[in-house]
Amino acid sequence: MINMRKSHPLLKIINHSLIDLPTPSNISVWWNFGSLLGVCLGLQILTGLFLAMHYTSDTLTAFSSVTHICRDVNYGWIIRYLHANGASMFFICLFLHVGRGMYYGSYNYLETWNIGVILLFTVMATAFMGYVLPWGQMSFWGATVITNLLSAIPYVGTSLVEWIWGGFSVDKATLTRFFAFHFILPFIITALVIVHLLFLHETGSNNPTGLNSDADKIPFHPYYTIKDILGFIIMFLFLMILVLFSPDMLGDPDNYTPANPLNTPPHIKPEWYFLFAYAILRSIPNKLGGVLALILSILILILLPMLHTSAQRSLMFRPISQCLFWILVADLFTLTWIGGQPVEHPFIIIGQLASILYFLIILVMMPLAGILENKIMKI
C-alpha cells in the first residue's frame, strides 16, 4: 500500500511543503523566521477572533468594550495582551526575516520577494487599522494624522481623505470600516502567504553561502520541524514574559485616555514598529515629499534585485558590503529612536541625516561596494 501522505490529493500538498520538502542542509537559525511568522499570524487570527466577539465598533462604546474585555471577560486580559504584543512579535520576526533576505541575497527569487514586499505592506496596513480600534487618544489622533497624509496627493487628495473617513473627520464611519478591514485583511494575508510559499517551493530555499545546494539537501521533517519547534518555544517564552510581566511596555500611555477630538496629545506617534518610517516622513519639511519618502522607504525593497551588482549572491564573503549592511541596521535603530522623539533640535537634524543615509546606503553605496568587491576578486 502506497503511503497515504504521498497519494492523497490534500495530504500530498502538505507532504511536499512540510515533510518531504528537499531543504539545504546548511540553513541557519535565520531561516526560522518564516515559520515563526506563520505561528504569529495564526495566533493573531485566533486571538483577534475572540476579541471581535466582545468588541463593538462604535465611537461611544469602543473604548468601554476593550475595558470590558480586560475586566469582565474570562481571560479577556490575556487574549487582549497576546493580540497587542503578538503584533510586536510579528513585526520583530518580519524585520528579521526581511533583513535575512537582504543579507543573504534571497531577493534574487523575484516572485517570492515581490509577494513578500506586498505582504509587508498589507501587514503594516492591518496593524495600523488595528491600532485605531481601542479608540484611545493615540488611536484617534494617529488615525487622523496618518490618513490626512493622503491629502498631499494633488487634485484628488482631499476628496480621497473624506472618502476614507466617511465624513469630514475621523468618526463612527471610520471606526466601523477600519474594524471591517482589520478583520478581513488577515485572511487576505493568509492567501498571500500561500502564494509566497508556492513561489518559494518552485525555486527551493536559498542558503547562507548563496550557492546552489541541489547536491546537498535533506528532508524538511524531522530535521527542520524540530528546529522550528525550538524557535516556537523561544518565541512564546519571550511573548509570555512580555504579556505577563510588562504588557504595556510597548504601548502608549495616551491610549488609556478615551479619544477626544478637542484635545490633541503633545506628541502624536504610531506604534514602535512604524517609528523608522515615521521618522523618514517627518524629516522632510514638504508634505508630499514626506509621504513619497515614507512609501519609498518600504517600496525600495522591490528595487534590491536591480541594485544587485556583485558576482556573489550572499554577503557572507563580502566584508565591505557587510559593513554597509550593519551600518544600515544601526541607521534603522537610530530612525526608530528619532521617530519617538519630539520635533525639536537636535532630533530634527539627526532624523534628516539618518534618512539621507538610509537611502544613500541602499541606492548608491551597496551597488558600488558590489562593483568594488568584483574588482578586488579579480586582482
From Swiss-Prot:
Residues binding a ubiquinone, per UniProt: H201
Entry cofactors: heme b
Record carries keyword Transport: yes
Keywords carried by this UniProt record: Electron transport, Heme, Iron, Membrane, Metal-binding, Mitochondrion, Mitochondrion inner membrane, Respiratory chain, Transmembrane, Transmembrane helix, Transport, Ubiquinone
Binding site residues for heme b b566: H97, H196
GO biological process, one term: mitochondrial electron transport, ubiquinol to cytochrome c
Residue spans crossing the bilayer: 33-53, 77-98, 113-133, 178-198, 226-246, 288-308, 320-340, 347-367
Subcellular locations according to the entry: Mitochondrion inner membrane
Superkingdom, natural source: Eukaryota
UniProt-listed InterPro entries: Cyt_b/b6_C, Cyt_b/b6_C_sf, Cyt_b/b6_N, Cytb/b6-like_sf, Cytochrome_b, Cytochrome_b_C_euk/bac, Cytochrome_b_N_euk/bac, Di-haem_cyt_TM
Predominant localisation class: mitochondrion
GO molecular function: metal ion binding; ubiquinol-cytochrome-c reductase activity
Protein name: Cytochrome b
